[in-house]
Amino acid sequence: MSAKREFSHITLASTPFKKRIDQNSLKTDSDIEKDTNIAHKCAERFNYNTNLHRKVTLSDRFELAALGYEMKAKPRTIIEKHNDCDEFHFIYRKEKKNDYGTGSPLSAGLSLSNPLPAGRGFLSPAIQNTSNQFTFSGSPRITPQKHTPVSANHKPARSIFDDIPSNIA
């Protein structure tokens, strides 16, 4: 998770999906109670870490999802707070919106048209723009990923050494 994102505390929501999981797996009341205790501990750990502005681990969220609890991005209503029913709502705090104004530059690899961060399995726009310039010169058994026709007019790729003056002593 990015350090710039801020999450508020979460609340758990027992859903029909959770009830169906419990019924299909023939869980006893004590097993269901154990699951709720584990879910409460995960949520408390999540909330504790976010309040201290620590990085929140994915394991808590995965564990909650494995137990069948759903995390929602809306706060509890006043009516739900007064009812205090057995259903608990462990919800994920909404992320702060980043201001992409003229004053704040986008973080590396991000753009308004492409909000995905550069990372594994993702080509940044800079790499995508230059990938058409490279021609394939490998063995004939390997097929090229991108092949540009020979008749296409394109400029040779600039080297990082082009800007260095030749009379360096």
UniProtKB/Swiss-Prot annotation:
What tissues is it present in?
A: Expressed predominantly in the germline (at protein level).
Alphabetical GO CC annotations of the entry are: cytoplasm; nucleus; perinuclear region of cytoplasm; RNA cap binding complex
What residue ranges carry the coiled-coil annotation?
none
Query: Would the keyword NAD be found if you checked this record's keyword annotation?
Result: no
Keywords assigned by UniProt, alphabetized: Cytoplasm, Nucleus, RNA-mediated gene silencing
Tell me the Gene Ontology biological-process terms attached to this UniProt entry: 21U-RNA metabolic process; piRNA processing
Q: Where in the cell is it found?
A: Cytoplasm; Nucleus; Cytoplasm, Perinuclear region
Summarize the record's disruption phenotype note.
RNAi-mediated knockdown results in defective activity of the PIWI-interacting RNA (piRNA) silencing pathway. RNAi-mediated knockdown disrupts the localization of tofu-6 to the perinuclear region of the germline. RNAi-mediated knockdown does not cause chromosome segregation and cell division defects in early embryos.
**Principal location class:** cytoplasm
The annotated region (Disordered) lies at 137-169
List site positions: May be required for interaction with erh-2: 61
What segments bear the compositional bias annotation Polar residues? 137-151
The entry's stated outcome for residue 61 to C is: In xf14; abolishes the interaction with pid-3. May abolish the interaction with erh-2
The answer to whether UniProt assigns keyword Transcription to this entry is no
| Quaternary structure annotation from Swiss-Prot or TrEMBL | Component of the pid-1 variant of the PETISCO complex (also called the pid-3, erh-2, tofu-6, and ife-3 small RNA complex) containing at least pid-1, tofu-6, ife-3, pid-3, and erh-2, which is required for the biogenesis of a class of 21 nucleotide PIWI-interacting RNAs (piRNAs) that possess a uracil residue at the 5'-end (also called 21U-RNAs). Within the complex interacts with pid-3; the interaction is direct. Within the complex interacts with erh-2. Within the complex interacts with tofu-6.
Q: What does this protein do?
A: Component of the pid-1 variant of the PETISCO complex which is required for the biogenesis of a class of 21 nucleotide PIWI-interacting RNAs (piRNAs) that possess a uracil residue at the 5'-end (also called 21U-RNAs). Within the complex acts as an adapter which binds to the complex via erh-2. Involved in the biogenesis of 21U-RNAs which guide the piwi protein prg-1 to its DNA targets for silencing. Plays a role in small RNA-directed transgenerational epigenetic inheritance.
**Name assigned to this protein:** Protein pid-1
Give the species this sequence originates from. Caenorhabditis elegans
